[in-house]
């Protein structure tokens, strides 16, 4: 007989699709980062610096994981010229891929 554990989810939790968690093409690091990104508020600072500030991963490590997520179409990073002429990056994050 198998035990079943239930967790009461009454506050501070995230609801997300299992799609990326079950995608065998993604590494555990990519699954973890995507899950973490999906748990953040929409107005959060989605940037390489922002992600590094809340992780023990190095800048190159985060960049590598983001590249993997881009290759599998879970993340798009758009490069746009900002108001002062500097480049800015917009992150589009997908729970499901088509």
Question: Model-found features: residue ranges?
Answer:
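Detector for methionine-enriched segments
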Residues: 1-2, 16, 37
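N-terminal leader segment of winged-helix/HTH proteins
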Residues: 1-11
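Short, Lys/Arg-enriched N-terminal segment that forms or immediately precedes the first helix
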Residues: 10-24
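Winged helix-turn-helix DNA-binding recognition segment
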Residues: 20-30, 37-91
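Charged low-complexity intrinsically disordered patches
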Residues: 93-98
């Amino acid at each position: 007989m198998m035990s079943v554990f239930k967790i009461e989810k009454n506050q501070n939790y995230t609801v997300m699709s299992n799609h990326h968690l079950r995608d065998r093409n993604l590494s555990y690091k990519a699954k973890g980062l995507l899950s973490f990104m999906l748990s953040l508020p929409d107005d959060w600072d989605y940037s390489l610096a922002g992600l590094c500030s809340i992780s023990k991963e190095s800048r190159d490590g985060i960049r590598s994981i983001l590249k993997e997520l881009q290759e599998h179409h879970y993340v798009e990073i758009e490069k746009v010229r900002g108001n002062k002429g500097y480049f800015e990056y917009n992150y589009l994050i997908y729970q499901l891929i088509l």
